[in-house]
């Protein structure tokens, strides 16, 4: 029986990272729930066993029920009936299976019906689901919107809404509008407080809303009359039970067919404020988007894993010229690079997730008591690390999953262009990952300051001092040379003092930094488990070294005056 977790031991390796000790310690707070909830862990080992068992259950559901339904869901898609959405029959079955297994509200405290899981094992579950059906993964993983409500909502909102998500109700985040895509400060959905109704009334249109007919919505709307920028925006909670939001249409998309992407019309929809006015975009949506970007990184890794599996299986079975095509260098070169990108991207994803876990757990503790000076320092450090790695994890993994599905189709040859193999679905589903929740270009905008302020370089230099196996020492030397090139290229861009030159070089610098960090992470993994990661570390070293050299050449040879050649009239 297929199991997306146990079939891929790389996940259990990431789960057992040494930082999990600190994460569990912070999350469970001396295991204080053990006397109140029979499913609360007694100690660290018990907590880790619980994560492992839930991942096993999720992997089994993903590898059987969700995988078996995926093709039918892709063909059927959701239905627009009146002003509402009806999921494809397979999607409804998938949701039912996940709810019955208790896989909702995973990161929420037990007092609300959650599992109190860290972000890391929850993110792994999101990867497992996406590997079978990325569209369904969107619906299920939008439960993590509840993190934002938990962080910024009040206790009354916590007690009313969080248990519903833990019980299996669905969520959406309603941000985008026809004239406000990447530029969210242009959002114009109007929020007006009604003294008569005793609530806020929302009016306007939202577009490209994933799972738009969800039970609970987090909505970005303009609450301040006469404003046109981000400071006039607030966040609201809309409950579908209140009425006032209709689905105008479901978009006809290239991929993720099971996920209903909706245009919504708000007509005096009753809503309540989440947090404080004017902080909707500049604080709450930024937190919401960071969580979503980690989720898309997990989705991308899941799709990459599925693409690699399909390519490997086809290459092993398909014979040409008297032997399986996997034996031809042109094919095993592609497969090896797919696996290296998969392993490197996954390492980056879970390094980021662990950093998020530590600072978020400390944030939560700070709501109960004052942090010690040591805890405040730890919180600040891991928050900065998480902020720096989030755009890399989302940007690089979404690009890698597009590349890996492309190569998997290439391995299939003409058969890959037919609709008979699942790889065509993975290819279509992958395309959106580098677009939604911030395009790759916007991830570069978020990441470039960590290049120019030296944060990524400092992380690389710290990695260079780590103990590694003898087999990996030559790779550390190569990674150091790559970091030297990053340092030189960064200095050149900063010295130029030209904004447009800085912007056109930004992606090159960010990818250089990502290549260096991911190589170090693979070196670390290969030191701990050579059997799982040594091949990928060597392959990725060859690939990333060439990539860094390419980007370095571009940046060092380009001049600010050359930008005139790039401007398209």
Which residue ranges define each predicted feature?
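A structural-propensity feature for long, helix-poor, extended segments
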Residues: 154-160, 439, 445-487
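Alpha-helix capping/hinge segments and adjacent helical runs
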Residues: 2-5, 10, 17-19, 256, ...
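Extended, charge-enriched "interface" segments that sit outside catalytic cores
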Residues: 1-81
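A short core secondary-structure module
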Residues: 199, 203-245
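A glycine-rich, basic-preceded beta-loop-alpha segment at the flavin cofactor/substrate interface
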Residues: 35, 39, 241-244, 248, ...
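C-terminal amphipathic alpha-helical interaction region
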Residues: 454, 466-569
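C-terminal helix-coil-helix/basic helical segment that borders enzyme active sites and/or dimer interfaces
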Residues: 343-394, 490-504, 523-531
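Internal helix-loop-helix
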Residues: 59-60, 90-163, 167, 210-212, ...
